[in-house]
Every structure is written in structure tokens, then in C-alpha cells.
Design a protein with these regions (language model features):
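Alpha-helical membrane-targeting segments
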Residues: 52-55, 59-62, 176-203, 449-480
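N-terminal, intrinsically disordered, basic low-complexity segments enriched in Arg/Pro/Ser/Thr
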Residues: 7-11, 406
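Short, low-complexity intrinsically disordered segments enriched in A/P/G/S/L with frequent Arg
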Residues: 12-19, 23-26, 32-40, 44-49, ...
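Acyl-donor binding region in acyl/amide transferases
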Residues: 147-148, 154, 161, 167-267, ...
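Active-site/acyl-donor-binding loops of N-acyltransferases
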Residues: 74, 78-104, 168-172, 209, ...
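Tryptophan (W) side chains
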Residues: 5-6, 50
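A conserved beta-strand-loop-helix scaffold within acyl/acetyltransferase catalytic domains
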Residues: 97-184, 242-398, 482-483
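Hydrophobic alpha-helix feature that most strongly marks membrane-spanning transmembrane helices
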Residues: 332-339, 354-358, 371, 377-378, ...
Length: 483
């Protein structure tokens, strides 16, 4: 039986037992240094650190590879500490990180898609707005924030029928709960710092809603769902995950995710997206038919105010690379103000999105006297404009009502370019309520890998799920659809 501090069987464990012992000593004793007399000393961590130390190590995955220098690199991966000799000539590692037998064949975990498995990966996500290219973009751009991996579901012949992306994360379970809940948890964390911060597998996308891969035989998701139901608990235990989570799946998946309940999963609402049909003749027709008199008056006052001063210029591009460095601080300003945070975009994400998905990516840019003051990152697919991320220059955003200006111009552009539906990412619900948008429920499907903990988790989830603490959500006409 593997001890918690030893490398997993599937790791490339080249470190010696002595090296592992030295690493364990430094990690489990906190900060270390030398006293003025030259004697080594160690600062002991809080007791809670010891309780979860093995799991911290299993998920402390920091890969650093320097191919140009052809040097030895310290590779820390899923609990194993390895010294790896890298060269420019060495091809990418495509061997399974983990392989397990199943009743339908086998399942393998890899961190890159081989040429043999690529057709299954591409066909499995072809019909979705976020296709295989988007998952590769997020893995490349956000790889330092989350460990991006792929689950290969193989049939009895060893042929890969479906490729399902997932993440390894260390997630705070009380994020999104009200202040009194967080204060209670923070009190416990003074003794147990990792209380309700658990290593988990998240099935889905690190920067967007989740989708389930279609299998190559039927072209549907039913076989994949059955395979995930059986394989995920085994994979989770092998990787040291405490929890398994299907992250942010649209309501259309409920009939399939509810099948996971028989496998010990619990479905709860996540923070929903919002949307509205674009069936008006133009924007003025939308204002007149959909919005209340008070809201129309309020918006028109804001638009008149925004028109004062230098004009606001509007442009749409498919590749924002030339402006990525300029717009990123605008996004970061919005990100820092957000009450809930998960992924954080960077220049690489913005640039790769435009270069690799020019057929779907649209970047909307607003300028004042040549300076970019706002931008929006959108995906257009199958008649739907997905308004995913926004950036605002708060030096002028409030005085010029940039949030409302950007929303108006985005909707007008969508109408004029054949979009039938406007989809907006979660949060900031108050203005969307007054825009007469409807909720688009997103679900979490959760299970603990430990059966006893799963019983406790089932009782905690209705308290921890974030939608119950947002009073604005209850005012939407279809709020009852959240569950």
C-alpha cells in the first residue's frame, strides 16, 4: 500500500527516498532558515496543516520545463517529486498519467491529446460553442492556475470513444456564501487552515460552461455519461481528490446529470447565466416592447449623459492581439471587484482565442479619443452571441455609464449580424433583471470520493450552494427553474 508521502504508481518517480524525505521535511515544517548562530530552525504550521498534508502534497503540481537550456528541471506532479532531464529533442509526453480497467473497457488520464485520440476529441465537442480548440486554449493560457487533464474513455477493444476534459483544483467550498457563514468558517480555519478547502476533480471547462463529450460511435453523450459515472470515483481516489464536481452545466444536461444521482452524486444550482431572445425589429423596438417605462427613461437618460464629451467610438475585431496588453488591465479592474472569482484571464488567453478561433471569437472595443476604455470578449456560434468577459476603465466608466453603453452596443451589433439570442455570463444580476432577461440555470453535480464524507456533504450542499444567498435571483420570472 502506498504511503501518502510516496509517489503514486503512475508517476515518473525518479527521485530517491532520501530526496523525498528532505522535501517532506521542508514542506511539513513550514518555513525554515538559520539562526544567527548558524543552527537550523523550523517554524511549525497550524495543526490543521498536518491533517491535510498528504492531500496538499498530492495536489501541489508545479511543472517547470526549460527546454532551451536543456537543464535538469524539478517536476512536482500529483504527489511525486521527480528530477527530469529535458532536451529540445524530447517529444511531448503522451503516455497515460493513470490507467484503470472498467466494465466498458478502460479509462486513462493524460495531460495531452495524442494524434491517435485527436479525432475523438475533436468530434466530441464539434457541435458546442466551446469546441476542442477552446479547451486547448484554456489549458495553454491558464495552465498555471489549474491542472488541465483529459479522461480517455476506451471500449473493450482499446479504442477511445470519448475524451472528457477535467481539472484538478483546490477549491474553497464557502466561496459565494454570505459573510456570517464565511466568518464562522474563518474561525475554524484559525485552527484548521484547510477546513472546507478540498482537492477536487472538476469535470468541465476552466473558463466557461461545461459540456459532455459525444462518443464516436453514437454521436451522443449517453455512453459518455455512463462511463463517467463508473470511472470518476476510481479516478478521484487514485488522484487523491476528496470531491468530484461537474462544473456549470446548462439545464439541458439535467436528464443526464440526474442519472449520476444513482451513483452518489447530488445536483445543486450554480450561479446562473442570463439571456434573452433577439426577436425585436431593432433596439428601440426592444426598449419599447420589453422594458418598463421607468427603465426606458432611466436608460435614455444614461445614454444622453454618455454622449456628452468626446465621442465613444465602437469597433469589432476577431483578433485582439495588437491591443491585448492595453485591454488586460481593464479586465483586471472588473475582476478585482467581483465578489466571486475562479479563473483569471491573461494576455495569452485573449491572444490565442482570436488566433485559433477567428470564426467564433469577437472582441468589441470602445475608445475615447483613441484610448480603449472598454472591451468585451464574446463567442458567436449557431445564432447565439455569448457575452463572456468585460473590461472597463473605471476612471471614466461611471461618468460615461460604460456598462450600459457596452451592453446596448453589443445587443445592437448582435441584432444587425444575424444573432437570434443574447447570452450573458453569470453575476451582476440587478441590471439584467431590469433588462427583462431570463435566468439560464447552470448546475453543479457533486460527490465525495469517501462514502462517509459523501453522506455529510449531501446535507451541507443545500447550505453551501451560492444561489440561495442572492436576493436578486428570486425576482426573476423563472427563478423556480434554478433547481
Amino acid at each position: 500500500m502506498r504511503r501518502p508521502w510516496e509517489p503514486p504508481a503512475f508517476g515518473r518517480a525518479l527521485a530517491t527516498r532520501a530526496q523525498i524525505a528532505n522535501i517532506m521535511k521542508s514542506h511539513l515544517t513550514g518555513q525554515s532558515g538559520s539562526s544567527p548562530g548558524g543552527r537550523r530552525y523550523h517554524t511549525l504550521p497550524a495543526p490543521g496543516f498536518w491533517l491535510l498534508a498528504p492531500f496538499r502534497l498530492q495536489f501541489a503540481q508545479r511543472r517547470t520545463r526549460n527546454l532551451a537550456l536543456k537543464s535538469q528541471v524539478f517536476n512536482k506532479m500529483v504527489g511525486s517529486y521527480t528530477l527530469v532531464q529535458e532536451t529540445e529533442q524530447e517529444p511531448p509526453r503522451l503516455s497515460p498519467t493513470l490507467s484503470l480497467p472498467t466494465s466498458f473497457g478502460s479509462v486513462a488520464v493524460v495531460d495531452q491529446i495524442s494524434s491517435e485520440d485527436r479525432p475523438a476529441f475533436e468530434s466530441g465537442f464539434r457541435r458546442y460553442a466551446l469546441d476542442h480548440r477552446y479547451y486547448e486554449i484554456t489549458q495553454s493560457a491558464l495552465g498555471k492556475q489549474f491542472e488541465h487533464l483529459y479522461l480517455l474513455l476506451k471500449d473493450a477493444t482499446g479504442t477511445t470513444r470519448a475524451v472528457q476534459p477535467f481539472l484538478l483544483v483546490h477549491q474553497d467550498l464557502v466561496m459565494g456564501t454570505p459573510a456570517f457563514v464565511r466568518r464562522s468558517v474563518e474561525a475554524a480555519r484559525r485552527v484548521f487552515p484547510s477546513f472546507l478547502k478540498l482537492p477536487m476533480i472538476m469535470v468541465g471547462c476552466s473558463a466557461g460552461e461545461g459540456d459532455i463529450a459525444c462518443d464516436t460511435v453514437s454521436g451522443e453523450i449517453g455512453w459518455t455519461v455512463d462511463g463517467l459515472k463508473e470511472a470518476l470515483p476510481q479516478v478521484g481516489r487514485s488522484l487523491g481528490a476528496w470531491m468530484l464536481v461537474f462544473k456549470d452545466y446548462p439545464k439541458s444536461y439535467r436528464s443526464f446529470l440526474d442519472l449520476m444521482v444513482t451513483g452518489g452524486f447530488t445536483r445543486v444550482p450554480s450561479m446562473p447565466a442570463t439571456g434573452m431572445e433577439l426577436n425585436s425589429r431593432d433596439f428601440e423596438d426592444y426598449l419599447s416592447r420589453k422594458l418598463s417605462h421607468a427603465m426606458r427613461k432611466n436608460l435614455r437618460r444614461k445614454f444622453r449623459k454618455s454622449a456628452e464629451g468626446p465621442p465613444i467610438e465602437f469597433e469589432v475585431v476577431t483578433d485582439i492581439t495588437p491591443y491585448a496588453e492595453e485591454v488586460l488591465p481593464l479586465y483586471q479592474g472588473v475582476y478585482q471587484r467581483a465578489a466571486q472569482k475562479f479563473e483569471e484571464l491573461n494576455v495569452s488567453y485573449l491572444s490565442e482565442l482570436g488566433k485559433k478561433m477567428p470564426d467564433r471569437s469577437r472582441f468589441l472595443i470602445w475608445r475615447i479619443e483613441g484610448r480603449i476604455v472598454a472591451f468585451a470578449s464574446c463567442i458567436v456560434h449557431d445564432g447565439v452571441l455569448r457575452d463572456n468577459y468585460i473590461g472597463l476603465d473605471y476612471a471614466v466608466a461611471l461618468d460615461r455609464h460604460l456598462y450600459f453603453v457596452t451592453w446596448r452596443d453589443t445587443v445592437i451589433w448582435a441584432m444587425e449580424n444575424g444573432c437570434r439570442y443574447y447570452h450573458s455570463a453569470p453575476l451582476n444580476y440587478d441590471p439584467k433583471l431590469h433588462f427583462r432577461m431570463e435566468l439560464e440555470p447552470l448546475d453543479l453535480c457533486v460527490r465525495a470520493t469517501n462514502p462517509l464524507f459523501n453522506v455529510i456533504l449531501r446535507r451541507l450542499l443545500p447550505i453551501l450552494e451560492p444561489t440561495r444567498y442572492d436576493p436578486i435571483l428570486k425576482k426573476f420570472s423563472n427563478a423556480n427553474e434554478l433547481w
